[in-house]
Regions:
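Short, flexible loop/turn elements at secondary-structure junctions
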Residues: 8-10, 30, 43, 55, ...
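Short helices/loops that flank or line small-molecule/ion binding pockets
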Residues: 21, 122-131, 144-159
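Ligand-binding clamshell of periplasmic/extracellular solute-binding protein-like
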Residues: 2, 159-179
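Append "and occasionally in soluble cytosolic enzymes with long acidic Gly/Pro-rich linkers
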Residues: 18-126, 130
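A bilobed periplasmic-binding-protein/Venus flytrap-type ligand-binding module shared by bacterial periplasmic
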Residues: 1-22, 29, 38-39, 202
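Extracytoplasmic/secreted cell-surface and envelope-processing proteins
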Residues: 4, 13-16, 116-119, 145-148, ...
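Beta-sheet entry/capping signal
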Residues: 3, 24, 106-107, 134-136, ...
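Extracytoplasmic/peripheral linker and loop segments enriched in polar/acidic and small residues
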Residues: 24, 36-39, 70, 136-146, ...
Length: 205
């Protein structure tokens, strides 16, 4: 499985991904059909949550997934991002978003040891640059990712996005683990890793 992990910290310099609506908008910048058909040669299927269409749990969450209407729609993504940034006082100057007179720069950690993830990172970087962000691309393997992404305090903002990859070991009905693993901070796999010395993501109550 392939996914994009975002750093949602609201500490430190202005971070556009601290804004929930902008994180949501990123879903519409990902051309899943392109990834499946071109990068995977048709050997895959689009996913919109951690439960794919072949998961035993998929039918239980399908009605919720369909309400989001996720699809490749960069115009919609740009509108959402523009609205949210302008509300917070950002302005676009010569095609680049600025906040408090500084360009908004994001760091995209892209796995260079996996050609599929490298391509996904390059494509999404172009989409984000088209929106008006300054994208700093940092390439590395899993060892480097353990240090930069999983081993750092999100508040340090050493990364903004990461081309994540993961796998499933079985076909499980009533999966009690995957939901917590992907969406709960107490499982210790969210940004911050539940380390009390780090900034940690918390679900809205």
């Amino acid at each position: 499985y392939y996914s994009i992990l975002l750093n949602p910290t609201d500490e430190g310099p202005f971070n556009p991904f601290s804004i929930r609506e902008i994180r949501y908008a990123v879903n519409f910048l990902v051309d899943r059909d392109l990834i499946v058909n071109e990068l995977l040669g048709g050997f895959g299927t689009s996913m919109f949550s951690n439960y794919g269409s072949f998961s035993a749990e998929y039918l239980r969450v399908l009605d919720v997934i369909e309400t989001f209407q996720f699809r490749y729609n960069p115009s919609f993504a740009e509108k959402v991002i523009t609205d949210e940034l302008e509300i917070r006082g950002a302005e676009k100057i010569d095609g680049v978003w600025n906040y408090e007179n500084e360009p908004i720069e994001i760091t995209f950690f892209i796995r260079s040891d996996d050609p599929v993830r490298k391509a996904i990172g390059e494509i999404l970087s172009s989409e984000l640059e088209e929106i008006g962000f300054v994208v700093k691309k940092e390439f590395g393997d899993l060892n480097k990712a353990y240090v930069v992404v999983y081993g750092s305090n999100p508040a340090e903002q050493k990364w903004s996005l990461y081309t994540e990859g993961w796998g499933s070991s079985g076909f499980t009905r009533y999966d009690s683990v995957a939901l917590a693993q992907m969406y709960s901070p107490w499982f210790s796999s969210m940004p911050g890793n539940n380390n009390p010395s780090n900034w940690n993501y918390e679900n809205d109550k």
